[in-house]
Amino acid sequence: FESLESAQKRGAKIYAEVVGYGNSCDAHHFTAPHPEGIPASRAIKQALDEAKFDADKDLLYINAHGTGTPLNDSSETKAIKIAMGEEAARKAMITSTKSITGHMLGATGAVELIASALSLYHGIVTPTIGLTNPDPECDLDYTPLKARKADLTVAISNSLGFGGHNACVALRKWEGK
């Protein structure tokens, strides 16, 4: 990741543009996320607002924190719905890179942001592998088992950490401006 000026000066291939960021900290519990997802929703909403996300025009890809645990996944589903509204949340294509890579602790956020940029660039939503019996509380499009082609315009990557440290980065597909 570097400034546009620097990337253009050296002739680098540009995959996506960082257009938004949000963060929150709720200190709800040492390890458990807030059960209603309210603090995480603030980080997601901040990033989407800063990115000027328009649910009527943009096709959104969400790289969920998605740890595959009942507490995290239901809380994150609620957070997405609160941040975007139910209708827009149902249009989003969501996946968990962790289903492919496992949880890499400190490296996870960077790897998932790179995966999000590549998804935008190639127009491919990676699958959430192993998702055969979703939790009824996780009722959004979590792209189970199979990758999908899509003309994505915006991606967000959620990192929801211990102690309620929540971060969300928004990317926009690079159009070569």
Residue ranges and their predicted role:
Residues Y61-A64, S157:
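Conserved beta-strand positions
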Residues Y21-P35, A64-D73, R90-D141:
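Acyl-CoA/ACP chain-elongation machinery
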Residues A43-F53, A79, A83, S116, ...:
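Stable alpha-helical structural segments in soluble proteins, enriched in small hydrophobic residues
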Residues G11, K52-A55, M84-R90:
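Short helix-capping segments at alpha-helix termini
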Residues F1-F53, L60-Y61, G176-K177:
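Condensing-enzyme catalytic core mediating Claisen C-C bond formation in acyl metabolism
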Residues E2, K13, P35-A43, L71, ...:
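Conserved active-site and cofactor/substrate-binding residues in soluble primary-metabolism enzymes
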